């Protein structure tokens, strides 16, 4: 007998099944995104208003 791959519901035809997608090798923690954003805002504020501080 041949092995059959489970295809899911017939109503989901054409939709992406995210569990079958490959995962990215680049992992970024949410803390790093927040840290880079805060650093960017601080650097931008210093460059913009630095002469007034």
Curated annotation (Swiss-Prot):
The entry's localization annotation reads: Cell membrane
Could you tell me which InterPro entries the record lists for this protein?
Answer: Preprot_translocase_SecG, SecG/Sec61-beta/Sbh
Membrane topology designation: Single-pass membrane protein
- Chief place where the protein resides: membrane
Q: Which UniProt keywords apply?
A: Cell membrane, Membrane, Protein transport, Translocation, Transmembrane, Transmembrane helix, Transport
- Return the Pfam families for the record: Sec61_beta
> Is Ligase given among the entry's keywords?
no
- Extracellular membrane side: 50-53
Q: Membrane spanning segments where?
A: 31-49
GO CC terms, sorted: plasma membrane
Biological process GO annotation list?
Answer: protein transport
Cytoplasmic face residues: 1-30
List, alphabetically, the SUPFAM superfamilies matched: Sec-beta subunit
For this chain, the family text in UniProt reads:
Belongs to the SEC61-beta family.
* Quaternary structure and interacting proteins, as annotated: Component of the Sec protein translocase complex. Heterotrimer consisting of alpha (SecY), beta (SecG) and gamma (SecE) subunits. The heterotrimers can form oligomers, although 1 heterotrimer is thought to be able to translocate proteins. Interacts with the ribosome. May interact with SecDF, and other proteins may be involved.
Q: What does this protein do?
A: Subunit of the protein translocation channel SecYEG. The function of the beta subunit is unknown, but it may be involved in stabilization of the trimeric complex.
**Protein known as:** Preprotein translocase subunit SecG
Gene source species:
Methanocaldococcus jannaschii (strain ATCC 43067 / DSM 2661 / JAL-1 / JCM 10045 / NBRC 100440)
Name the encoding gene, please.
Answer: secG
